[in-house]
Structures are given as C-alpha cells and as structure tokens.
C-alpha cells in the first residue's frame, strides 16, 4: 500500500513519540522532554524531522540533526532517530526515510551522514543497504545543562 514521506508538523510529534516507545531519552539531562525538543526541531534550519504516513496514520519517522565539522570538511548530518511501525512495511518505510534524510543532508551541504550503530542485526542490514558502513565509535562525555549542575 502507498505511503508518503514528508516534513513533520508539530501536530505529528505526539504520534512520533508514541511510535518511538522507550527509544527516546526521558528528558532527565535537559529541561525539555523528547516531544518538546522535537517540536522545536521542526522549525530549525539545521534539523529535519520527517514522517512516513498512510491515510493520516504515522508509519515511521526520522530526525536528522546537522552540525559543523572542521575535521569532516563541512557539515555532518546525524540521523538521531529512526522509528518505524513494525506492523507496517518496516524495510520499505525505513529505506524511504533514510533516503529522504540523505537527500536533505546533501541539500544542506553535509559532507557525511552518521547514525548510531543499531543492536538489531535486521536493522543493521537496513542501514547497510542504504550505503552506511561500520565506523569507529566516538568518545562521548555527558554534560549537565547549566540549570541542572550541582
């Protein structure tokens, strides 16, 4: 059955958060919860929030965040969230969402796009079919927002 990938609207965010289940943070590291943060990202030029829908039902979604990188020689896009309804067509929907994220990243001048390594082997295969390759993980240090420091 046919579905459409389009830019998300703020009215889509609750459905996207519900579809995400426990994959989103609880908001404990910042003042905004996941839904509030995604609503802001809808309007920011350095982010792309997408949804896949069929007959007004959200089948999946993706968030692409863009940051500058001197090392990469331009901007780097990060697909920060990719969720699909397992009852739908997860392979086709995720492929369409990733493809649209890559198109958006190219249009915004990104030199590369990265994503977190999935734990699920089937999900890993989906990413590799889209041209993603294994890369060395990054070092990370959590920083408490200024209002939450003790």
Regions found by a protein language model. Give the residues of each.
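Conserved N-terminal entry element of GNAT/NAT acetyltransferase domains
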Residues: 1-11, 146-150
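Conserved beta-strand-loop-alpha-helix junction that forms the acyl-donor binding cleft
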Residues: 114-124, 142
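A short, internal acetyl-CoA/4′-phosphopantetheine-binding micro-motif in the GNAT/acyltransferase core
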Residues: 81-90
């Amino acid at each position: 059955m046919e579905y459409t990938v389009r830019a998300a609207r703020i009215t889509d965010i609750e459905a996207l958060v519900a579809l995400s289940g426990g994959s989103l943070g609880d908001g404990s590291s910042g003042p905004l919860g996941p839904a509030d943060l995604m609503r802001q990202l809808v309007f920011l030029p350095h982010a792309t929030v997408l949804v896949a829908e069929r007959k007004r039902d959200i089948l999946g979604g993706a968030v692409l965040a863009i940051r500058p990188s001197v090392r990469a020689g331009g901007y780097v896009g990060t697909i920060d969230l990719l969720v699909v309804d397992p009852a739908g067509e997860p392979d086709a929907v995720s492929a369409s969402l990733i493809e649209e994220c890559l198109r958006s990243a190219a249009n915004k001048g990104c030199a590369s796009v990265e994503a977190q390594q999935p734990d699920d082997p089937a999900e890993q295969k989906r990413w590799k079919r889209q041209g993603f390759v294994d890369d060395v993980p990054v070092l990370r240090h959590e920083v408490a927002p200024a209002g939450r420091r003790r």
